[in-house]
Amino acid sequence: MARTDDDSWDITESVGATALGVAMARAHESESDCPLFTDRYAQVFLDAAAARGWRPPTGAMGQRIRAISDYAASRTKWFDDFFIAAGGTGIAQAVILASGLDARAWRLPWIDGTVVYEIDQPQVLQFKADTLQAAHAEPAAHHVAVPVDLRQDWPKALVDSGFNPDKPTVWSVEGLLPYLPAEAQDLLFERVTQLSAEGSRIGVEAFSEDFFTDEYLARRRQRIQEMREQAAEAGEDMPDPEQLWFLEERAHVPDWLMDHGWQVSTITAADLMERYHRPVTADTEGMPTLFVGGVLVDKRDE
């Protein structure tokens, strides 16, 4: 089903179901011989979803998830380290945008007094809360769920939940931007900047300028079509991931942040995976993804 500007979803459908795919990758990494991280809650979420009738992807889709598992693990590790480093500077307020099913508020070593705000669709956060409560999981920081769509007035919901914009904050934007229209992406970063005190940090998974080239998109679509045909031959249905994305020209994230007072550093997906000694496979080779870290050094009145 194609996306609309006001759609919503449960954990087992549309954008929500992608969180289960990422949880599969985290569960796989956690059980590997030399994991970059351990997320003992990933399998808990998968089991809870299965109890609701969800079935893990098999065939071509399952193969795709396994193929990008090293990328997903590297991404998780980068954001984990980003939060921990922010805590090392004394930042004790974190906001996870589109938090999905990653249990960072439960599994990371937060400094004393840290408040972690998680923003996502109401049904996603309810599933997460119910599952973790049933598992008797206790957060490692003060956890505050903020159930609101990021295309709505989430800043008001965040402040109403206790967020203090006068304190430095560490923000994460992971696995989110392609699910937002271009204008919504700009608005997201405008709001983050407005809510950030100087010294705040932001970590972003972004696409480079090469992602939206005709050449790359054509290669990607061909690969997806091949996988969907393989799934059909096996009698399985593989949804088209592009139906969930807004594929349109948008601002280059590092440039946008620098233009609005953020000091920025970047690393490509390939270089990040090399850092963690993870192989770049045919499914991840040439993936034009950037991991962007920013520090707000010039708070402006805009």
PLM segments and residue spans:
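Rossmann-like AdoMet/SAM-dependent catalytic core
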Residues: 2-5, 214-302
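Cys-based phosphatases of the PTP/DUSP/CDC25 superfamily and their flanking regulatory architecture
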Residues: 18, 155, 168-169, 181, ...
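A short, conserved alpha-helix within the catalytic core of class I
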Residues: 145, 153-156, 179-197
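A short SAM/SAH-binding and catalytic strip from SAM-dependent methyltransferases
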Residues: 163-184
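Conserved beta-strand signature within the Rossmann-like core of class I S-adenosyl-L-methionine
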Residues: 170, 189, 194-210
